């Protein structure tokens, strides 16, 4: 995710820049061979706290692996990311957003806290202070309660206006 150099603007979580997509892809590509295997995908999902079954990993791989070579390359990954952040998602889009939200909502109370965000980022190998996570939450928290609800998360993930007022971990 790209660094934000303008101190007055808030960073964005959207993976719009090729280097941002490549950076996230590289986190999944544990062995650095330029492709994501089912085992690598399972490892990242496990690090995020998901107990995804082998069958579900297979379904995810099948959905993203459009050339059917058994791996996800960076182009397939980028196409998937673009589809997942489409402001007009397919009928299954909301369910997929809900699943993503639930990965962050560790205590399953329907809200993402700065503590939960910090835990997930730490599991992903990101090094952010808790106050950074508080700021990320604030930038998406439209009702000011200190948490991100599913509706706030959905709005953030489907916003394509080019508005960079959404949260991304500062680098």
Curated annotation (Swiss-Prot):
Ca(2+) 1 binds at residues 29, 31, 33, 35, 40. InterPro entries: EF-hand-dom_pair (IPR011992), EF_Hand_1_Ca_BS (IPR018247), EF_hand_dom (IPR002048), EF_hand_pair_protein_CML-like (IPR039647). Residues 16-51, 52-87, 92-127, 128-163 form the EF-hand domain. The keyword Zinc does not apply. Keywords: Allergen, Calcium, Metal-binding, Repeat. Signal peptide: none annotated. Gene3D superfamilies: EF-hand. Homodimer. This is Calcium-binding allergen Ole e 8.
